[in-house]
Amino acid sequence: MTSVAHEASASTGRGGEGTPLLTAGGVAKTYRTGWWPRRRAKAVLRGANLRLWPGEVVGLVGENGSGKSTLMKILVGALDRDAGTVALAGRLGYCPQEPVLYERLTCDEHFELFGRAYGMPDVDIDRSRDAVYDTLGFADWRGARVEELSGGTRAKLNLGLALLPDPELLLLDEPYAGFDWDTYQRFWELTRQRRDTGRSLLIISHFITDAERFDRVYDLVDGRTVPR
């Protein structure tokens, strides 16, 4: 059975119905460093395959340097691939590992800035922003500048900006790094709610401790995705 066929058969259950929100096939990426004649090539991805259906929580696990973040950047269009295909359906939200925040702006100003970039009406920005504050529990910091925030609150804001447009598909790179226990539990309750309404999440990490929370898990090994 091919890898693509394997992952399709593994998608039965919650997933496997309707149109996939994400399909990636044969994704390859090689980084090249140095100058001729000593130019070196390092193949990071050698044919990665992924498929996410509506209403799924999928994990992507690999060691540091295995290419997880490279694959994520390719999936969201932030990095060109050398080979392979990527097809997306619906709105996409992306929470990078390194927060994309502005030190001198407040939390409220971030939501206003990103909401307008998403093309959201002001009333929708306000409603979604307030829901994010309530869900993640950091409304008390709405008027604070990023430079005043702890690492954990920055992580909440980073995640909240990805949640703002209520995307059908949410791609998260090490999303709960820096979360305390309460926020960690809030995150998984949020994940459950989104899955129950047909939305999907792809979560990448270097380890998974709560495997039962995922519908499926891929291991990224030698540049290839291996379904568990």
Regions inferred by a protein language model and the residue ranges of each:
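Catalytic Walker B motif of ABC-type/P-loop ATPase nucleotide-binding domains
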Residues: 170-174
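The feature captures the beta-strand-to-loop junction immediately N-terminal to the Walker
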Residues: 61-63
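Conserved ABC ATPase "signature" region
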Residues: 112, 116, 123-141
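Helix-to-loop junction immediately C-terminal to a conserved catalytic motif
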Residues: 76
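Conserved structural motif at the start of ABC-family nucleotide-binding domains
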Residues: 22, 45-47
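Conserved ABC ATPase signature
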Residues: 145-152
